[in-house]
Amino acid sequence: MRVRFTIYNEEVENTVNDRLKKKLLCFERALSTLEGYEGWMIGTTTLHLDWQPKQGENEFCHTKLTPEIIKKGRSAIRVRIAAAEEEKERENEGMEVLLVKPLQSVLVPEKEKMPLMKAITERGSEDDDTLAFSRSQMEEYLREAADTNPIHQGEAAVLPGFLVMNACLLRLWKKGWMKGQTALEVRFLAPLRPDEEVYLSDSGQEGRNAVYLRTKQEGKEILSITEK
């Protein structure tokens, strides 16, 4: 993994961490308001982010974010989530998501709202980039993001892709992989289940600035993050 800069200022780190969590959650809440695509899965996500804190940052979640279908097919749609036109001068960050209809429909009985989660479960050390996401963490994320997708419920539930992506982005920022304004492409390659251990590693290809999340047991690729 290429480390291009390092920040040891804990106050700055906490500010950026908090900012990113809130910002991504705002995008994801906006996506959850899109109707008629329950059970569809994320194929790719393109993010345009500014990692530097801004004046009036706590106002961000009050910015009107609108999901707009920009390309539609029978089995896939592309959705853009960005600030309303009148807010774009102040807020130019955004996200595009490719949603894919699964080959088989998922029918899961509705469940009541679930309790608040504990902190992220991380096994291993910061050095080996090991992560594991508990079921309680998944349940809290679903509540906060207003995510009612049935594929994330029940005994056979898979983790929300954005939950996994968010944790990876925070870890990569701490390691100095991203700075300033950044455009990223995230590809969701395989589903991940609660408590399954994964780790971050680079692509292993010279000149390719990409990071992969792989399962510890089988080395299966779960997602890739590439700087555009």
State what each model feature region is:
Residues 37, 88, 123, 131, ...:
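Homeobox/homeodomain signature
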Residues 135-212:
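Acidic/His-leaning functional-site neighborhoods
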